[in-house]
Amino acid sequence: MTFKTLDDLTDIAGKRVLVRVDLNVPVKDGQVTDTTRIERVAPTIRELSEKGAKIILLAHFGRPKGEPVADMSLKAIAPAVEEILDQRVHFAADCIGDKAANAIAEMNDGDVLLLENTRFHKGEEKNDPAFVTALAANGDLYVNDAFSAAHRAHASTEGLAQHLPAYAGRTMQAELEALEKGLGNPKRPVVAIVGGAKVSTKIDLLQNLVKKVDALVIGGGMANTFLAAQGVDVGKSLCEHDLAETAKSIIAAAAAAGCAIVLPEDGVVAREFKAGADNAVVDIKAIPADAMVLDVGPKSVAAINDWISRAETLVWNGPLGAFEIAPFDKATVAAAKHAAARTRQGSLVSVAGGGDTVAALNHAEVADDFTYVSTAGGAFLEWMEGKPLPGVDILHKQK
């Protein structure tokens, strides 16, 4: 895996550097409620600023469908960026044209300028050549630090890298290096944990993983679909009965590839989904007809932790149970803590990603102990599915 990084950028004082960042952060009542994505790109911005570059930030926010929408303006995000950088962040009311050009002309070396939402122009999502040219006119160099948007072939994520010398920012670099360790060229055995509610959203992912990992642990609601396909009565549990044949084909593909499929042996069942609901641990073949499985049971956790103990590499996407509500978080927390402990010992490379997964690891208070936790969502999932990522592929081509 070869691409240029900030290490390849020298003598950039006074140069205009267009930096694609991810500022698509949650906002409530005009305030940013989670600054994780801003914190992730801060090191790249600081490093470029210290080298004397003029840093021009490009980002999208929401889905404005190619025209200005007042409450999707990036102006509201600028104060949060300022606070994290501890540096003044200037703002331009457009990302191309005179408003952008005039703001850039007033920049001093080391300054940071945030341009308006790229998606206020239809050309962004269409990767329109004229729009790409207009964006490229604002810079001398291009840095992509938004892996989370790398699965989109948009003007600011892919088009610009064809017009300007292109480099990976520090977050992009860290993400790509972690993913290479996770699935690209991993230490074996490799174990994947895939959970979450539905098989239907993760068919491509499961079909790709069985070819690449030594064991695939299936948890969450999606495990019920696999169990039902094997003739287990899952009661009132969340289950996609119409995907029984898909589940069987994934099991067959795993067998052909020598990948062990690990399904729950026992489950925590309840008759209602609420905090503190009456619950019981039952054998997976003894689920009451009027109950639903909301977590995997202790026997299953022991088996999962045994696989984690044998693994050199762990890739995790999706919780094992309905972790948002106690006590149905126990399995996810136990497996996460075990993986974190082995990672701290230096015995395991652990890579995790996806919104629910990040929330679950934070809930277990172990996110910082994993080798890498991706905040990228869709891009992380598409990488796990083995799909090309245009924003990454173009960086490789430039090298």
From Swiss-Prot:
This protein's pathway: Carbohydrate degradation; glycolysis; pyruvate from D-glyceraldehyde 3-phosphate: step 2/5
Coiled-coil annotated spans: none
PROSITE patterns assigned to the protein according to its UniProt record, in alphabetical order: PGLYCERATE_KINASE
Broad class of enzyme this protein falls into: transferase
Keywords: ATP-binding, Cytoplasm, Glycolysis, Kinase, Nucleotide-binding, Transferase
Keyword ATP-binding assigned: yes
Matching InterPro entries: Phosphoglycerate_kinase (IPR001576), Phosphoglycerate_kinase_CS (IPR015911), Phosphoglycerate_kinase_N (IPR015824), Phosphoglycerate_kinase_sf (IPR036043)
Family, per entry: Belongs to the phosphoglycerate kinase family.
Oligomeric and partner information: Monomer.
Name listed for the protein in its UniProt record: Phosphoglycerate kinase
